[in-house]
């Protein structure tokens, strides 16, 4: 965060991260699907699918008519609020440097109470409040995610389709995540599904 000269560089980095991590995720999911097919086929469940009965193939072999894989993005509103905070406070208003913001996060906001209060206040743009400033950043991230996932093939002859749903995993994910630029402290839940945090 302290090496970027422009916010466009930040957005480019976000896109690169989405590309890298969606590659990792899709590869991992394909390995898991191959393992299911080889180690744990589902003949009993497959018997309830007319398509599987007609094709003579197990669900894990692509016996069903629809064979999509739908990985779900989690914490998107948290990320949108992070980008909004960076854009507003570091680049647009220059109220804090990237290095200072990064240090506050590394310190879990301890010793940075004024900045913590500002980031969590209505003075900073937040996603989901009919605020185009932050909502456009959510849109950008979701478009990155969709672009890097949509149309990829899975092991069953289907395709990956992006979604945004954390169910209740956002709590566990937050427990294992350090503090974030949006004013979330270490261990606090990340955003739920597509819902706003602030």
Pin down the residues of each PLM region.
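Acidic, glycine-enriched catalytic cores built around paired aspartates
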Residues: 1-198
């Amino acid at each position: 965060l302290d090496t970027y000269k422009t916010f466009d560089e930040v957005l480019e980095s976000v896109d690169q991260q989405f590309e890298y991590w969606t590659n990792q995720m899709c590869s991992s999911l394909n390995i898991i699907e191959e393992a299911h097919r080889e180690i744990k086929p589902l003949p009993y469940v497959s018997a309830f699918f007319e398509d599987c009965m007609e094709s003579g193939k197990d669900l894990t072999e692509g016996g069903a008519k629809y064979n999509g894989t739908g990985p779900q993005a989690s914490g998107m509103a948290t990320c949108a609020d992070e980008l909004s905070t960076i854009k507003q406070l570091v680049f647009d208003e220059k109220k804090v440097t990237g290095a200072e913001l990064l240090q506050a996060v590394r310190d879990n906001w301890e010793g940075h109470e004024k900045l913590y209060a500002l980031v969590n206040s209505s003075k900073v743009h937040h996603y989901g409040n009919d605020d185009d400033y932050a909502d456009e950043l959510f849109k950008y991230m979701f478009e990155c995610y969709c672009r890097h996932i949509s149309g990829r093939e899975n092991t069953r002859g289907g395709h990956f389709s992006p979604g945004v749903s954390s169910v209740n995993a956002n709590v566990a994910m937050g427990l294992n995540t350090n503090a974030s630029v949006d004013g979330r402290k270490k261990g606090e839940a990340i955003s739920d599904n597509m819902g706003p945090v602030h």
